[in-house]
Amino acid sequence: MKPEDRFFSELHKAKILVVGDVMLDRYWYGEVNRISPEAPVPIVKIDTGRSKETPGGAANVAMNAAALGANVALLSVVGDDEPGRRLAELLEKAGVSAYLHRDAEVSTTVKLRVIGAHQQMFRVDFETAPSHEVLLDKLADFGHMIADRNVIILSDYGKGGLTHIASMIEVARARGKTVLVDPKGDDYSRYRGATVVTPNRSELQTVVGRWKSEDELTAKAQALREKLGVAALLVTRSEDGMTLYEKDRRSHEPARAREVFDVSGAGDTVIATLGVMLGAGMPLRDAVSVANQAGGIVVGKLGTAVVQPEELRGALAAA
């Protein structure tokens, strides 16, 4: 029996709180047959019968955790609008307990992708930052909601929903909670004291600069980990897999993807799977290995998607 097998019957013990920037991912599908006479751009004739809506950002993290069988709550801010209501419907259908503060001053973030000729032609983003008052209300709710949760996932998409993330980490760690952070931007001091921070390769380069060798990367990653006072730094590296940096230790997981169709949302799947496995009692290094497998599965799907337990078990059995 592989070490991860016995934990699959324990996934319901993972009680996850996801906090962060949510959005609605919309996909319009069509055909491309000609170039516009108005500008050198393709014309996409939309098939009105082919469209898709999925929760994105922190909502996608919550969806992935729920799909694995965890007990999941989501805390975020949306606008008082149709996309916000649609998000709430989709989350409820997936079994996520969503606590969405409605801010009439903002629009729910929507990412509209137009797909033609089997590829994404372009993306249109609709977004505004939430108000200070709503964010303070969310911070107060956070203090109450973490009581019965064993893992907190903070999903930062840089949309303003995690303005008080430093306070959230401080409160959660004071209560002994495992805190995972999917970071954004170049100011990682806000994540000080978290348990694990999970930047991708590009995000890490923004903070520590480029590296020319594995030894240089290790030195930079360990220096950042120590500076932030986090237990571990998990760097996702696309085709190069992912690397975990702990105190006096580096461990690497090679990439598992057989085919890559779409990398959007892969980081959400990785941190969600990591959180669920830790919440079920799995040791960190084993949880990273499982999360790596989940990431390899989801990049083989088009658009933001989730990984089902049977898919994950199958991939682990074949590894």
Region spans (language model):
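A short, aliphatic-rich alpha-helical micro-motif
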Residues: L11, I146-A147, Y188-R192
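Short acidic, glycine-rich surface-loop motifs adjacent to enzyme active sites
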Residues: R149-G161
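Active-site metal-binding loops of divalent metal-dependent hydrolases
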Residues: V22, Y157, T269
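Conserved phosphate/ATP/ADP-binding segment of small-molecule kinases
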Residues: K159-R250
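Conserved N-terminal subdomain of the carbohydrate kinase-like
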Residues: K13-I16, L24-V151, V306-A319
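Conserved post-catalytic alpha-helical subdomain immediately downstream of the catalytic base
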Residues: A231-A232, R256-L316
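Buried hydrophobic positions in well-ordered alpha/beta secondary-structure cores of metabolic enzymes
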Residues: A65, L74, L91, L112, ...
